[in-house]
């Protein structure tokens, strides 16, 4: 296994262009699926980032989409929808509309993004030798020393692309 940066170029560029922006808030429906989650870990079907730069606000809705290789192997890729519409902060999402059964969670951050990294966990199919992207990770470094890791949620042997884990790594 190796870790490589295999997130599509346009997604990387969209987020790297946000370096220097202030991450104001994180919004998501309050969903915790895994009873073994650790302190500082939160499980959501989608996550919205509210960013401020030069007096403008932007909302990035993040989720994971399921894709298939030519050989039919499933893998997961980070999917981002950008908007300047404030309603996006409260759950509007093309693939995962807001579910009123789960109240939104709002975390005030107020820290500047200093760096953005992408890691993709790549496995080798033993039968074909084909490389398969299994777990994309987005890492946001903030100027207060905190790192935010956003990864797909794995539930035992079952993988769902409809949920993600937010890990807050303190300074």
Language-model region placement:
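Surface-exposed, interaction-prone regions used to assemble/regulate multi-protein complexes
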Residues: 1-171
């Amino acid at each position: 296994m190796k870790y490589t940066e295999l997130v599509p170029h346009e997604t990387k560029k969209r987020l790297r262009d946000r370096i220097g922006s202030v991450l104001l808030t994180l919004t998501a429906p309050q969903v915790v699926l895994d009873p073994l989650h650790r302190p500082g870990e939160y499980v959501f079907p989608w996550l919205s980032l509210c960013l401020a730069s030069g007096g403008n606000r932007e909302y990035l809705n993040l989720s994971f989409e399921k894709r298939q290789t030519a050989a039919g192997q499933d893998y997961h890729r980070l999917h981002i929808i950008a908007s300047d519409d404030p309603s996006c902060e409260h759950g509007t999402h093309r693939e995962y509309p807001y579910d009123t059964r789960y109240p939104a969670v709002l975390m005030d951050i107020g820290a500047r993004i200093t760096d953005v990294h992408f890691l993709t966990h790549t496995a080798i199919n033993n039968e074909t030798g084909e490389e398969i992207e299994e777990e994309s990770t987005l890492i946001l470094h903030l100027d207060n020393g905190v790192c935010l890791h956003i990864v797909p949620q794995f539930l035992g042997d079952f993988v769902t692309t409809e949920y993600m884990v937010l890990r807050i790594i303190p300074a």
